[in-house]
Amino acid sequence: VRGYMDAEAYALSTYQTASKLCSGGTIGAEASCNKIFWSEMDLLIHETAMDLLGARAEIEPQTAAEFAELGSWLDGFMFAQSGPIYAGTNEIQRNIIAERVLGMPRK
């Protein structure tokens, strides 16, 4: 349930950012918020899928039928691990939010 709710919240946040850009605005710290939210949501969704699939999650699909049934959750899970690191670590993104949104001093 949380993964679904997070995905819906992320979609709304993305729509808000796109709307702001379409109306001539610029984006700021909300890009950092979106990045953090997305990378943590991606981890949650893939961890949940791995838990639900159990040992089957570790088996790469060998046929089209297996791929249709299981997808490639293992690949997605492995890729999701890098989300909090690439495109600026989540720690850096949190510092940007602290400085630009909360007005805190630089670290």
Regions found by a protein language model. Give the residues of each.
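Alpha-helical interface subdomain recognition
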Residues: V1-K107
